[in-house]
């Protein structure tokens, strides 16, 4: 059964932080339930648990998986960021190597005993790639939607366009429906993406250490990234499956949910079929 969203505490960055999370089809005591694949959903740069809408439930129901959706610090109903917070160029690495492991531990998820499936969108996809490269034995497979593997001019230009006063105001009003404090996280996120220090950020070398299957998905109309993002994954990780979706922008799970659910089912079944 699916549980209601809740909060769990972690220690990070010298303080206690409450993280919003939700289990989907959580263990109800059925025999063999613990062996059911667990998919962890990692949201985009301005996303949250609630902003996934019902896509995680759709995917888990179709693929007969358990799911875990988490809002990172500052996002959704998690502990808000203090006003004026600014992130360094390693902000995605810190989320992957510090926050995600702490969240999994706090929730009792032992990825050493049962490797995870990670499904990340945009910044969340980058976090998934970094985590899989650092902890290859803990990841069964990756699904990355519109990932950022390096910084492109079109990404920076699209984020810069959000700074126009009327655009910013409208965006913050929409985000207020999903975040306790949208302005600090928007400012921290947009500031680092627009900083000169971040222009040379890349995870190209890290990705070569990924050992699990990867399904990399990009919309052909994505204003935040080109197909070179997922093609760079294919060059780094042998056997990567690429899915290029027409009539699809930066959010494949919103623009083409049925195609994505079908692709994940095929991807999961192929991987599970490799097991003895």
Segments predicted by a language model, with ranges:
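Conserved hydrolase catalytic core segment
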Residues: 112-152
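Conserved HGGG/HGGXW glycine-rich cap/lid loop of the alpha/beta-hydrolase fold
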Residues: 25-82
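Active-site nucleophile elbow and catalytic-triad environment of alpha/beta-hydrolase enzymes
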Residues: 189-206
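Acidic catalytic loop of the alpha/beta-hydrolase fold
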Residues: 220-225
